[in-house]
């Protein structure tokens, strides 16, 4: 696509004529984030093992990332048609009957766990809390 500026429409200061071969915003960035896409690949959750140094001191730092989904604090049925997809992560420690939600996409920090083996369940969820993908991380806090 050509963008042309002719000499008859030039601003003050005698700016020369310019022709640019430019890609459209859609060519560079992809489809608008405001339109749902039927052919998006499925969302995926990737969870790293906790960092060994802090675990030895009783502190657990677990990083995660997602593919084909943005982690944002957006909830409800109205967010189901947003593209790229949005969602959040449910996090359950050991056999707790409750979980907490992370919508930041930042490193998860756990402190105050008793010495011994632990597991943390990460569940990638859509805006209406349906689980899309899950990963479990296991580690041991030393005595």
Language-model features, listed with the residues they occupy:
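Short beta-strand segments within Ig-like beta-sandwich modules, predominantly Fibronectin type-III
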Residues: 97-105, 111
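Short beta-strand edge segments in extracellular beta-sheet folds
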Residues: 138-142
């Amino acid at each position: 696509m050509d963008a042309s500026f002719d000499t008859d429409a030039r601003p003050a200061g005698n700016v020369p004529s310019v022709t640019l071969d430019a890609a459209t915003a859609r060519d560079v960035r992809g489809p608008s984030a405001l339109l749902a896409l039927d052919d998006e690949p499925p969302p995926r959750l990737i969870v790293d093992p906790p960092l060994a140094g802090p675990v030895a001191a009783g502190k657990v730092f677990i990083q995660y990332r997602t593919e084909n989904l943005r982690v944002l604090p957006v909830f409800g049925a109205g967010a189901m048609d947003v593209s790229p997809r949005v969602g959040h992560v449910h996090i359950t420690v050991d056999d707790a009957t409750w979980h907490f939600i992370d919508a930041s996409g930042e490193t998860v920090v756990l402190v105050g766990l008793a010495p011994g083996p632990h597991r943390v369940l990460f569940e990638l969820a859509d805006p209406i809390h349906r689980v899309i993908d899950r990963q479990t991380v296991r580690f041991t806090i030393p005595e």
